[in-house]
Structure formats: structure tokens, C-alpha cells
Amino acid sequence: MSIGYLALTQAKPALEAQHGAWRSWYHYFPWEDWRKGRPEILDSSIEPRLKEWAARPPQRPTPAHPVSRQERVRICFGFDGAAWDEEKVLDRFELLYEAGLVEEASRDGREAARLWSDRPRLGAPMRFDHRRVLATAIGRVRAKIKYRPVIFELMPDEFTLFELQRTVEAILGPHLHKQNFRRLVEGAGLVEPTGEVKMRTGGRPAKLYRFRREVLLERPAPGVRVKPGKI
């Protein structure tokens, strides 16, 4: 049994003195990053190989599964017209592991991994089951920002709405519509203007906002309820 905890923190310069380095979680899960549109790795590497794996007969008898391999692939990765669910991070990684398509499957001696002669590099591997733990954490925080104001724990005390939007996008994966995002955040009463502005190079000053803490007492689930692709 392994238990993982996710801690939210802001980068500190002291980390460099400890010979550590920050890495985007998309370094390990590149197929989850939709900020510039559908990731190319899905079409070039993941979809054809997962469909090939799904069509293979099982190497040994396996317990009956209520959903076929083909349907699991379609549902988890949004292939063939299915919707992409940004919260299924762990489901997607476990499917790639089961299909033998990630380095951890080869390292663990999984039979499915030995069947690939052209296995691509799908993100950077991690030690032990750490990439699985990270996948679990990403899925949980993607779900939680929709009903709890955890996004503001990653923001400075004062921020612009553009900075807030970029942070939400970095967590959820996709690009969000600027005006719709602003209407949603302001309409939900999550932020309030500070009365100050932030100067930007080559543009108008941007208003500064802060998290409106009174919202915690006004309703039980004050999150940023965005749905990628629909905002």
C-alpha cells in the first residue's frame, strides 16, 4: 500500500541550494496539457498503439471486465467522439501502464511491455509508483478547484484576472475563454478589486484583485466551476 499526499506551495529560491529542480507535471504527463489545443502525442503515439493493444487477445485469462478494452480506451482518452474528462488522469495513466506503453511497465517486467518493439517515450518516468501517485494528485486537485477555493492558495495576495486564468489553465490543462472566465469568477463573488493596478509592458494597466474570503461563509462549495471546452 502506498499513500500519497499533495502539498500546494509556491516556488522558493532556496530549493536550488538543495540541488532540487521544479518540473511541470506535464513533463511527466504531456498528453494532459491542452493549453495549446489537442496534444500531438495523442494522435501520433498514444491513440494508434492503444487501439492496437485493445484489439489484441489477452495473453492469459483475465477476470471479466464490465467494459471492454476498446470502450475503456475511448472513454479515458476521448477518442472517436467521446468527451475528454480532465479528471481521469489516473485512469489514463493506469491504462497506459496496463498496455505496457510507459517506462514503468517495462521496468516492472510487465508482459505487455515486452510486446512493443517501437514503444515511444510517453513522458518522463519516475521512481517506484511515484508517477501513479502524481496522477492521483492531479486528478484530485483538478476536481477540487471546482468546489473549493484551493486555486487561491497558489496565488499571491493580489493578482490580475489574467494571472488567475493562467493558473487555472495550468492545472486543468486547456485554454479558457478570457471574457467568459472573468464573468464566471466575478459573478461567483470569488474575488474583489483592491483598487490598485499592475502596469504591463505595451498595454493598459490591469486591475488587481484579491480572494474574497467572505464567500467561504456564504455558500458551501465556492470553487472555480469551469468546464474546459465550454467556457
Where are these regions (language model features)?
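Unchanged
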Residues: 1-134, 138-150, 167, 197-202, ...
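The catalytic Nudix box helix
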Residues: 5, 164, 171, 179
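Charged, low-complexity intrinsically disordered regulatory/assembly segments
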Residues: 146, 161, 181-183
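Short acidic, hydrophobic short linear motifs in intrinsically disordered regions
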Residues: 152-168
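Charge-enriched amphipathic alpha-helical scaffolds
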Residues: 175-195
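Charge-dense, extended regions
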Residues: 188, 196, 208, 212-214
